[in-house]
Amino acid sequence: MRRDSSETKRKILTVCVRLFLEQGYKSTSVSQIVDEAGVARGSYLNLFPTKDKILLELTETMFGGQFGVARSIADSKLPPVYAYAVETAIQLTLTELNENLREIYIEAYSQPDISEYIYLHTTAELKQIFGANFPDATESDFYEMEIGTAGLMRNYMARKCDIHFPMERKLSRFLTAAMRVYKVPEEEQARVLAFIQALDIKAIATEVMVKLFAMLEMKYDFKLSKNGETEEAR
């Protein structure tokens, strides 16, 4: 029975992740999932009572694997705030490259259980990066600050770039607001922003997206259709 349940879960996840990336989270119905996975609706609901349970699993995979490149871009000799800036700039840019990724991220930051995972996942990293600015702060303090900066991230991801609000402006606004929360000195903020502006962040984010999709294809054993890719990724 356990093997059957494990196989059913694998089939469901394979179909769900592919459909979320190809057509979007909200456009993927339970009926479509069970039809394409070839499983009974009852079996699906036993394993995943709601779609956001699947989204949580996908979010854990994405957050676990998408940002390794940031550490290599931000030289280890630089202060850790540079890695934070690269990571967040990549995430904001990813959502401009692919509307289905935008929807996945916004849903993840909006669902209580998933946003809680994000807060907890990020808190330890924030303490490591910005701890020197808050010598008496606890992990709880950084958790509470992350609730605020995660809200900034969600809202900046949701607002699409246009001629009046280009990507460069979005990155600058988000990073300035976040760095002020974490008490980064103004002079250091200016250096970090100049560093980010000197990067080809769109090319970097495109590379991250291609690697992310490849990792998800391998983990969940599926192949994205060409329609699931952005023009930049082809």
Could you describe each region identified by the protein language model?
Residues 128-132, 162-234:
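C-terminal peripheral helix-coil segments that are non-catalytic and often amphipathic
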Residues 109-161, 165-176:
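Amphipathic alpha-helical packing segments from all-alpha helical-bundle domains
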